[in-house]
């Protein structure tokens, strides 16, 4: 939660950052990308400032791995939607996964930050926090049903994920919620006929994969998901 001085960067700090990225549900290749970028910045600073190299990235994962399957079929999506779940946390995690899928793979951060004002004239209109691109999605009853089940905690946000009046910062709330949801989704993976572990990112990748199987042009899928061109 604070800035880290160059002299404080060691294997312990880098290891803690790597663990944080893993708990965020990022893939190994994405973690490697972040680590390599951070290492390049560190090496540049060491060279320009002529300071000792403490080699903080000696134990960090900086390789690339073969990408594993990260999408589930429409059949599996239906199985997940039809599950009779016992606990609130299970229902909440499942429904947010489905909400992401219904909204063309919306990221968890964007879902959490949605406000009631984002729904206008039958459309969900929002800007991706990652790219700033504005997206418009037709508002469906399936989305409204989920919103109705998890009402706003503060009267401002669309879903009951973040609370402006809580003691913890919105960033802390997002991190806690995302970790809990991904942990719960991992357990739900065993209840349906799939061979991968569910995360919020799987919802995003599943929408893109299933759209592609319906012969939706890749360019349209990319635009729909808010990718930078």
Each language-model region and where it sits:
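Basic, Lys/Arg- and aromatic-enriched nucleic-acid-binding interface segment
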Residues: 51, 56-108, 112
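Short alpha-helical segment immediately N-terminal to, or the first helix within
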Residues: 21, 99-100, 114, 210-211, ...
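Short, contiguous acidic/charged loop-to-helix segments that flank catalytic cores in large enzymes
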Residues: 85-87, 125-135, 168-177, 195-202
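Conserved tyrosine-mediated DNA breakage-rejoining catalytic core shared by Y-recombinases
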Residues: 12, 59, 113-149
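Short, basic (Lys/Arg/His-rich) helix/loop patches that form interaction surfaces
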Residues: 82, 86-88, 182-223
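N-terminal core-binding DNA-recognition domain of tyrosine recombinases/integrases
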Residues: 1-68, 83
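A short, basic/aromatic helix-end/turn motif that makes direct DNA contacts
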Residues: 113-118, 222-228
